[in-house]
Amino acid sequence: MIRHIDIAVQKIFEMKEKEPAKFKKLIDEGIMIGLGVDLGDRSREEYTAGHIKEQSRPKDPDYAAVTEAVIEGDSEETVRLTVALLEKGKDPTDLVLNALMPGIQTVCELYDIGESYMPEILLANEALIGGVKLCQERIGEIRYEGKVVSLVIEGDLHDIGKNIVAAILRANGFEVVDLGNDITVEAAVKAVKAANADLVVGTTLMSTTKEGLKVLAEVLESEDVPVACGGAAVDRRFVETFCNSVYGKTPLDAVKIAKNICAGKSWKEVRNDLH
């Protein structure tokens, strides 16, 4: 007979493999309890999907409907509701900050605890973009934390990870110029100059293409635009072999890098802090 402890261990390892975010939360909470820190009911409650949604829901019911549409990844409904509110005279900047952004932020927080997945983030991101574009038409430029160019380097067509990073950067207040996948160094440099970007986030899933990130970082050094490098084929050791680059293992690392670069830190300072 299999003991209960064996079943529990098996399930824990399955969670680590299939739901790493949820596994991390479990481990973090377990460590705190082991150290004698009482998390209390409220702390545990904050890890639940229901609590996260409740905390992010705007008090204004019209705004809450927009937020929910973004969470559900319903682009058509998001656009319809945004148009209706703009026609009612709602401030477009306020709509972006307090109706649209809470939606994508909620989905990203749910992803962090293993309660949402890549397809849901991508759908929410599309819904967000649809609403933001409508608001931009009314107000012109929206003030962002900074401008980031996002891309998958030449030779690699895999862009799911890049899309996740772009969505989470947008959720944290950054303007993202998404170039897509299979982007040459020349095209990337041209786009960076045209956008006057603060940072490039470059990813690749393939070891055969990762050298392109090195070339891009070296070329952009003269433009004083660093490259945050990530993806399955990239690790810290590789990134530290060339200048003007910082390694990010997770999408949230990209946010940390962007915030530090846009705050005026050099790539060397950011690398020293985060590596």
UniProtKB/Swiss-Prot annotation:
Keywords: Cobalt, Metal-binding
InterPro entries per record: Cbl-bd_cap, Cobalamin-bd, Cobalamin-bd_sf, Met_Synthase/Corrinoid, Meth_synthase_dom
B12-binding N-terminal domain segment(s): 53-147
Residues the record lists as binding methylcob(III)alamin: 158
Keyword Metal-binding in annotation: yes
Domain of life: Archaea
Gene Ontology BP terms: homocysteine metabolic process; tetrahydrofolate metabolic process
GO MF annotation, one: cobalamin binding
Transmembrane feature ranges: none
A cellular component term, taken from the record's GO annotations: cytosol
Keyword Metal-binding in record: yes
Boundaries of every B12-binding domain copy: 145-272
Function, as annotated: Harbors a corrinoid prosthetic group and acts as a methyl group carrier in methanogenesis from methylated-thiols.
PANTHER family, sorted: METHIONINE SYNTHASE
Family statement: Belongs to the methylamine corrinoid protein family.
Listed name of the protein: Methylated-thiol--corrinoid protein MtsB
